């Protein structure tokens, strides 16, 4: 997977490229990330990248010319088939379905806004999609871009040690994850559920599914409204509701 980053602060992405699963993916050439800083496309000695908005009001906007030129340069390197994404509070809210949808793209450019945002005409002419990571405001698009990179990279073949992990994580099937346990067997008087030490893989699977359903029902019941539950899931959910009534 190839990802281009348009950012005034490309150094922030060391958190993605040098550490953890994504850092390993970069070192193994499974994930390639390139950067374009709009400051490098300015012509004045101050490398100005902000400008006043028409109509007045507080704050500044990113200057059109440096940002547009940076996007064009990134597009020319990426070639055909690249999708340009602007990280914006006005965008489609990211969820696991959105992550899997984005992961099907082999080439993406993430445009990270700053100040009060970017000129609407750039959105209309240069941006393919807008995405948001939640209903709150951040100081820039870098953290949302890193969130998207981390999430989609998990679906790149061979990035995870066990590819099934991406399919078994929270939200992979629209449900919250089940509880997990490791050694020691007892911790502060609490013990590991016996079923997990039984060696019965089918019973363990059923226990995990029930726990996942229960967590979702108790903590995020709205997630269940959009799911087409299997017969097994429906029966387990009925049991859960009876046990908690």
UniProtKB/Swiss-Prot annotation:
Q: Entry's Pfam families?
A: tRNA_m1G_MT (PF01746)
Q: Which residues bind S-adenosyl-L-methionine?
A: 113, 133-138
Going by the entry's taxonomy, the superkingdom of the source organism is recorded as: Bacteria
**One MF annotation (Gene Ontology) recorded for this entry:** tRNA (guanine(37)-N1)-methyltransferase activity
* Keywords recorded for this protein, A-Z: Cytoplasm, Methyltransferase, S-adenosyl-L-methionine, Transferase, tRNA processing
Query: EC number(s) in its UniProt entry?
Result: 2.1.1.228
State the GO CC annotations. Answer: cytosol
What does the record give as the reaction this protein catalyses?
A: guanosine(37) in tRNA + S-adenosyl-L-methionine = N(1)-methylguanosine(37) in tRNA + S-adenosyl-L-homocysteine + H(+)
Enzyme class, UniProt record, top EC level: transferase
Q: Please list the GO biological process terms of this entry.
A: tRNA N1-guanine methylation
Subcellular location per the Swiss-Prot or TrEMBL entry: Cytoplasm
Looking up InterPro entries in the UniProt record yields:
Alpha/beta_knot_MTases (IPR029028), tRNA_m1G_MeTrfase_C_sf (IPR023148), tRNA_m1G_MeTrfase_TrmD (IPR002649), tRNA_m1G_MTases_N (IPR029026), tRNA_MeTrfase_TRMD/TRM10 (IPR016009)
**Subunit-level organization:** Homodimer.
Family assignment from sequence similarity = Belongs to the RNA methyltransferase TrmD family.
Q: What does this protein do?
A: Specifically methylates guanosine-37 in various tRNAs.
Q: Which PANTHER family match?
A: TRNA (GUANINE-N(1)-)-METHYLTRANSFERASE (PTHR46417:SF1)
**Name of the protein this chain belongs to:** tRNA (guanine-N(1)-)-methyltransferase
Supply the gene name: trmD
